[in-house]
Amino acid sequence: IIYSDKTYDEVKAAFVASPLPSSLKSKLRSFLEIITKPLAVRSSGLFEDSLGQPFAGVYSTYLIPNNHPDFERRVEELENAVRLVWSSIYTDSSKAYFNAIDSMIEEEKMAVIVQEVIGNEYNGKYYPNISGVAQSFNFYPFSYIKPEDGFAVIALGLGAYVVGGEKTHRFCPRYPKLQLASIQDMARDSQKHFYAIDMTNAEYDLVRDGEQAAMKSYDLK
C-alpha cells in the first residue's frame, strides 16, 4: 500500500471492505450495548507521541451520533469509523507529511481510541459548552504575563472549531481578566458560529462524506 500507485479512495475502499477480527467486533458490540452517547473515534499512533515533530491533525477523527434505532446499523457505523481511522495513515497529506519530516511511514503503529464525546444535546445538536487547547509556554506574552504562564484558547462547541484556527477567545489561565484586545476588537473578532454533531440525521455516510459527515456548522444568533 505504501509504495503502490493506488489512490487513497482505493485504499480506503479496501479497508472498508476488509473484515475486522472477531474478537474486536465482539468488544465493539459490547461497548455499544452500554454506551449510547455520541462517539469520537480517533487515532493513537506512535508518531503522535513524538517529542520532535507535531502530528496533531495528520490522521482522521470521526464523530458519530450513535443514535440509529437499528443496533446493527450502529455497529456498522462504528466498525467503519475504526477502519477509516486506520486507513488515514495512507492519505496523500499523511504521506506528504512523513516525507517532509524525513520519517518512514512503515514504522508507524496505530491503535484506535473510541470514547464518548463530552457534551449535551440541545434541540438536535450535540456539543460541549466549551472546548479548547492549552499550552504551557506563551511565545508572545504581554504586560506582566510571563512566557511560562502559558495560554489557552477556547470556543463554544466541538473542538474542530479551535484546532481549525477560527476566531476564538485567547487568554492566560493565570491572569484570565487581562486582555490585550479592546472591547470593540473582541466584539468584531468573536465567534460567529460553532460546530456540533447533528443528531437529527441518521443517514450520514462516513465513507462518502469523511470526517464532516455527522458534524454541522450552526450560526450563533
Where do the language-model regions lie?
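Conserved mixed alpha/beta core segments that line enzyme active sites in large multi-domain catalysts
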Residues: 15-221
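Extended, well-ordered alpha-helical scaffold/bundle regions in very large, multi-domain proteins
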Residues: 1-13
